[in-house]
Amino acid sequence: MGDNSLSNEAITADNILKDAFSQKKQIAATTKADILDLEELKDWQRRKRTEYETVLKRNRLDLRQWMRYAQFEFDQKDIRRARSIYERALLVDHGFIPLWIQYIDSEIKWKNINHARNLLDRATNALPRVDKLWFKYLLLEESLGNQGIVRGIYTRWCSFEPGPDAWDSFIEFETRCLNFENVRNIYSKFVLVHPQIDTWLKWVRFEQTHGDISSVRTVFSFALDTLTSFSGTPLVDIERVIGSFASWEASQGEYERSRTLYRLAVERWPISEALKEQQIQFEKKFGSSKNMEDIVIAKRKAEYEQYLKSDPYHYSTWWVYIDLVEEKYQEQLTSAFQSFIELAKPKSLVKDSSWKRYIRICVRYLVYLELTINDLPTIRSVYQDILDIIPHKKFTFGKLWIMYAEFEIRQNNLLKARKILGVSLGKSPKPKVFKYYINLEIRLKEFDRVRKLYEKYIDFNPSSVQSWLDYAELEENLGDEDRSRGIYDISMSNNVGLSESDQLIVIQRYIAFETDAAEYEKARELYEKYLILSRYDVNIWINQALFESTIPTETQLIAYQQSHQDGNFDDDGEEEFSFEITPENKHHTRAIFEKAISYFKEHNEDKKRQQVLQSLLEYEKVHGNQETLEKVNARQPSLVREKVTIDNIEQESYKLDFPDDRVAQPPIARNLLALAKQWEKNSS
């Protein structure tokens, strides 16, 4: 019944608090000692003092214990004893700030102002870098209305050159007292101790509030002179003071003063983007649009020149500088390029990014000379100067040699172009130059020169498979099959040293060449080499088999030759040659497939054997009949499960079961195998 009443009762915060309070553990109250007379009081005080002294004997460095001891004596109104304890504690560690603060607060609490003043004087003398003690001293004196003493304390404190907070506090005090001349004197010392931009700007704000235009301008001038005289002043501080100075002058309508200030500043610090941006914004707001762009561009040009004088290897700046000169100072562009070539020569003896960027700008200069100046002797001289700078024994730039040769070709000076390319190959052969020279001679149909160049190219880099293939293709296009065949043979010899992968590429092209030349027997021989070189790759077996169905038989060749003799051409004047797959082609293809199947069967490579059978099946689907297709389909392997015992553990595995292998077994073995499988099935 009681439970139901509780469930129906509303739960309130009051009920929750009462329940929590009732479950709260009761803490046993400490024994209270009632002191009835003076005798008992003195006895209790003696015992407490003994306890404190005993604890301090064990650990006299526990300053918090000293403070509790002294506070106890103050609570007992025994000021003499409390002072004695504080003094003893200060002898232990006079640098403990909370001890000084409690000592001073205790004296102030008992209105012992002179004693508190003496303590503050002692504390600030002993610890002049502790701002808290100074502020407490100042608070005490200012609350008593002793402005003269406060000013003296501030003066003494600032003689120690404290942080900005002390100076700001002194300035606020004098401002409250309306002693503005004293504030100016303080600022004059403040900026010497803390010559940062923030200090100067505080002084400026003060003069803007309590001074006149002349005083503000004087402070700005002093600030700018002082900050620029220090070599370690950050540029951002100088930018701030100049920006503030110029903005203030503009606000007073002194636009020429502001403009002159920006101009001198940009000339003095040309690398300052902030000053340039401020100057641009000023001109947009107060200047004329006619001269603003020219002023900005001139300043930017001077900035680039100053920067490149200090760092001539900054090629990105050179590029931008040349862009600017080309756009606005066209008459100075040639001298700018010449300065670049002379001043920005890379020092590195390796072909790094600095050389590439240097040559890129040189190429730009050469293009400019040819398209604009068109002074041929000057262009040749510049080409020669640039080529003389490059250490060709270490590296070279094929693009530059090719440009020089193309320039001479455009001047119809083919002999000079060949000489340039020859010098390039003699000093530092480059594949790019070889290819360009070869293509040039091919276009000129100077094939004897092309052959010599290919021989030099292969001699320079015999491991380049592409050079061998291009050389062979050249001879093939020229109709010299023997030369082409010889190049293929030499490239595959051991003396050349091509890698296996490159030899596979060569022999593949070699087969295509012999096929195009109708040398099918040679192509078959190459396929045999191809198989050996590829370690009897299954795909090459398949390709060889299919190859037999893509070439004509002897009968077809004879028919083609007779047709050729009879002059049987189509409408376009080309020879007709109709090719059909004959039973002979199919026979050769199937024979190679069977050879591949036997090879992989002999070497127990079931996966590859299956792949060959699958390819044979696809072939029969296209070129076979129903009978051959069914035979090949019947030879396809199936996946069977078998049990294998490994380390006395019977495991299941899967293998490919080829019908050809079953057919090859004798009848008795087949019967036994069938009976064993039937018994295994019945047992399971």
From Swiss-Prot:
Entry-linked Pfam families: HAT_Syf1_CNRKL1_N
Keyword tRNA processing: no
Coiled coil: none
Entry's localization field: Nucleus
SMART domains given in the database record: HAT
InterPro entries tied to this protein: HAT (IPR003107), HAT_Syf1-like_N (IPR055433), Syf1-like (IPR045075), TPR-like_helical_dom_sf (IPR011990)
Keywords: mRNA processing, mRNA splicing, Nucleus, Repeat, Spliceosome
GO cellular component: post-mRNA release spliceosomal complex; precatalytic spliceosome; Prp19 complex; U2-type catalytic step 2 spliceosome
Subunit (UniProt): Associated with the spliceosome.
Family named by the database record: Belongs to the crooked-neck family.
Function: Involved in pre-mRNA splicing and cell cycle progression. Required for the spliceosome assembly and initiation of the DNA replication.
Name of this chain's protein: Pre-mRNA-splicing factor CLF1
Source species of the chain: Kluyveromyces lactis (strain ATCC 8585 / CBS 2359 / DSM 70799 / NBRC 1267 / NRRL Y-1140 / WM37)
Native organism taxonomy: Eukaryota, Fungi, Dikarya, Ascomycota, Saccharomycotina
Gene: CLF1
